[in-house]
A protein has these predicted regions:
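Nucleotide-sugar donor-binding/catalytic module of glycosyltransferases
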Residues: 1-103
């Protein structure tokens, strides 16, 4: 089964990021990596991402200076190991079968 890299740009989304991450780790397709790119958040977004990464080996966090959405996505692409890339915004809640149905 091919690895799917899910790239999530993160910037000051403390109220939403946990819901997003929880929806990603519940995916029915298990062969995923979640790359959270903290684009210089000034709230607790980056800290929350780190907590999830410590608890789940499928999650990686990249912390970088703020460079905007495209810069964050490009950082995620560079770090991705998957055959397929999936982009999710940090305020999204996705269905548990999103990756399985997409791939």
């Amino acid at each position: 089964m091919s690895l799917v890299s899910i790239i999530v740009p993160v910037y000051n989304v403390e109220p939403y990021i946990e819901t997003c991450i929880q929806s990603l780790i519940r995916q029915t397709m298990g062969n995923i990596e979640v790359i959270l790119v903290d684009d210089g958040s000034t709230d607790r977004s980056g800290e929350l991402c780190d907590q999830y990464a410590e608890a789940d080996e499928r999650i990686r966090v990249i912390h970088k200076q703020n460079g905007g959405l495209s810069s964050a996505r490009n950082a995620g692409i560079s770090a991705a190991k998957g055959e397929y890339l999936l982009f999710v915004d940090s305020d999204d809640y996705v269905s548990a079968s999103l990756v399985e149905k997409t791939v």
